[in-house]
Amino acid sequence: MKADMPLANGLQALPSNDPHMAMRRVRRLHFVGIGGAGMGGIAEVLHNMGYTISGSDQAANGMTRRLQDLGVRVACGHAAAHIEGADAVVTSSAISATNPEVAAAHAQRVPVVPRAEMLAELMRFRYGVAVAGTHGKTTTTSLIASLLAEGGLDPTFVIGGRLNSTASHAKLGQSRYLVAEADESDASFLFLQPMLAVVTNIDADHLPTYGGDLGRLRATFREFLHHLPFYGLVVACLDDPGVAELLPSIKRPVLTYGLQETADVRASNLRYSGTRAQFQVTMPDRAPVQVDLNLPGAHNVRNALAAIAVAAELEVPSPAIQRGLQQFAGIERRFRAQDITIAAGRITWVDDYGHHPTEIAATVQAARDAWPGRRLVVAFQPHRYTRTRDLFEDFTQVLTAIDLLVLLEVYAAGEAVITGATGRDLARAMRMRGVEPIFVPALADCPGLLRHVLRAQDVLLTLGAGSIGSLARTLPTTLSPEAGSC
């Protein structure tokens, strides 16, 4: 770690912008699985605070390359030698206890710190804004960070997606504000103790973490919200049934948002124009504000309302809120739309991370609102066999509302195959409903098939949280008129 001055006990002082005097014994932090969005973002912030950061991952990706460009030492593969000299080892829930670096840390009595606990340490001496919810966390966190920055508050942020305006997942700001996602997938958000918490929605997902019990999931959200101090603030989406059901039991101040007339922060006069949404916002103690949001869909209007509520609470002026929403540059793989030319003519291609039935339905509706009357072609890769099993009927229902579906095999994300929960099983269930999807077992075959089925003026959606995201780098080329048939 960079030192401002030596200490009498031989330790070094922390950098002047680091309030964590209790961490003065920590100079070097090693991240196992540093290529993950959440891990890499925290590593980048700590690197910029002056800590010596190293890390490892199974394979290089955009995150590892960015960190290497910043001067972080990143190893490909895992080996016990990588932790030599580390004062603590940071891991994500995806890393097994049998990982050689984790095992070596335990053997050497080096603290092994969960990712969320390290995020909690970053938040401990700051004004923490934590965004929780099954859907919309990344977009809402990005919007909040953008509005605070537009208002001159210069926040630190850690986001699960790459913010296009900064080309990064994270930034070390100079103010006391820290904005971050709160991850319910492994219940690790219980490490956090923010000053302000947003809850976008509570839906059935990651149920294996909660023993398959939706009630237990909701109870864990309640526990998270009670980690706020009694003078903190919960910003909650009144439109979501899961959140609305929880509100009577929340013993903290609450500010609601949504499209309902009873919401504290409410959108009205909503209309769509291409990939933008226009609406008026009414909120306590401010004049109504007219908003031109550079995002499509009612779900993004709600995400924007959450960000507006937080920005208003932190006294960002209304003109800055309007500018921030109008100029918002979006996030990688969140409704990223572009027109491309294929052999049949021009089409619109939207790439999106959505992989839950609720997210798919919202993205499909946003596309229909943006380009009414055009044929909608969706290439969807289900993510995890457990999710496909738990939400099988919901997937079947939402996917039947698409004009033409290209269905890929499930992206396992390390899970074993579950009988009855494969992509082929989904395709079979849809055929029983009278819908004929095109099943493609291998992702590599998808571009070639799309060349044959796409027509001029189609809207193509590529959806999923797995390897389908790699199409974003190659699809315009593989679908171009100059490309050969696959």
Describe the predicted segments one by one:
Residues 1-118, 233, 241, 266, ...:
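N-terminal leader/targeting and accessory segments in enzymes
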Residues 14, 19-30, 38, 45-49, ...:
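Nucleotide phosphate-binding/pyrophosphate-handling subdomain across enzymes
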Residues 28-31, 89, 129, 155, ...:
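Conserved hydrophobic helix-helix packing surfaces used for dimerization/oligomerization
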Residues 45-48, 68, 82, 93-238, ...:
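Phosphate-binding loop of NTP-binding sites
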Residues 51-58, 234-238, 377-380, 401-412:
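Short internal beta-strands
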Residues 56-57, 75-78, 113-120, 158-161, ...:
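Beta-strand->loop->alpha-helix junctions that form or flank phosphate-binding loops
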Residues 101-110, 226-232, 251-253, 362-371, ...:
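P-loop/Walker A phosphate-binding loop and immediately adjacent motor/lid segment at beta-alpha junctions
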Residues 266, 396-456:
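C-terminal helical cap/extension that packs against the catalytic core
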